[in-house]
Each structure stands twice: as C-alpha cells, then as structure tokens.
C-alpha cells in the first residue's frame, strides 16, 4: 500500500505555487504538534477505556493526515476511529504504536517527495 496520496500533495503544491504563502510546511508543523499530544492522549483514553474519545482523537488526526496526503496514516486512524465507536475490546495499543511509527515514516517520505518535486521544477 502506498503511504502517500500524491494527487493530494500535487494539489497542495499547485495551490502553494499560485499563492504567495507557504502552505505545506505549516501544515506539517501543525501535524507534528498534534502528534506530540494526541498520541499520548490516545493512550491515556485507552487506559480509561474511553473509546469514544479515542475515536474522536483518531478522527481529528485522520483529517490532518488526509489534508497532507498521508494515506496510510489516515487508514490507521480510520480503523482506530471505527473500532473506538464500536466501543468493543480491540487491540488498540498495537495500532496506536503502528500509527506513531507510520506518522514518522510518512512525514519523512512526504519530505523526500517534496524535495524531489522541487528539484524537478527547478
């Protein structure tokens, strides 16, 4: 499975190119800030068995991931969101761990993709 939705990223690049504002970097920075508190918050809500709140956090993170074209991250978040809404016993912790790793890998891959795209455009 592809980590990135390159079509979404290309749309962001197009929008950024046609405006005087930097768009993608602030979005990545914001996502990294979200990660710093959302992942621990997910674990905390899991410990409290507050699956509904865990689902809400996953939904919010999924939205940010989709905006940046982080397809695999969004898929993991969707699973967490769906299972959290079901409020059943589910192996949340391994998936939260996978999410944390996938976020780092996908952000790195996005950065590489952006550098390659800018080199081609030059």
Question: What feature does the model see in each segment?
Answer:
Residues 1-56, 60-62, 66-122:
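Two-component system phosphorelay core
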């Amino acid at each position: 499975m592809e980590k990135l939705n390159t079509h979404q990223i290309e749309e962001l690049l197009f929008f950024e190119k046609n405006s005087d504002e930097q768009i993608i970097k602030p979005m990545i920075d914001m996502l990294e800030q979200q990660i710093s508190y959302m992942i621990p918050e997910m674990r905390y809500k899991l410990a409290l068995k507050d699956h509904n709140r865990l689902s809400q956090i996953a939904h919010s993170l999924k939205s940010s991931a989709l905006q940046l074209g982080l397809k695999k991250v969004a898929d993991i978040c969707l699973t967490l969101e769906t299972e959290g809404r079901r409020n059943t016993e589910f192996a949340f912790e391994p998936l939260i761990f996978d999410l944390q790793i996938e976020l780092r890998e996908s952000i790195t891959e996005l950065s590489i993709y952006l550098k390659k795209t800018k080199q081609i455009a030059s």
